[in-house]
Amino acid sequence: MIEYTVKVDDRNYFWYLNGKRHREDGPAIEFAGGTKEWWLNDLRHRENGPAIEYAGGAKAWYLNGVIYSEEEYWNQLKPPKELTVEEIEGLLGYRIKVVK
């Protein structure tokens, strides 16, 4: 089990692990006004939804500290598509040569 350091400042909660904002089982920052932020290793990050949920309902999508539009975010989480050389050639419309 992970042991976090939780700091409370004027009803705002901040979770830390080894001095970095970090929490794996929920938001690492919970503001008294309702905004929540997910952090891992001091980077905004969440793989199952927005990394920031603002109290007013707006959302921001981050992976490893990089902000994405919602569409870009979900595309980043899709597994890479595996293609054969023949499939790639079919998509490109011409032959390719694999080099190493």
Give each language-model segment a name.
Residues 79-100:
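Short, low-complexity, charged amphipathic interaction modules
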Residues 1-80:
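Glycine/tyrosine- and acidic-biased, solvent-exposed loop/turn segments at the edges of beta-strands
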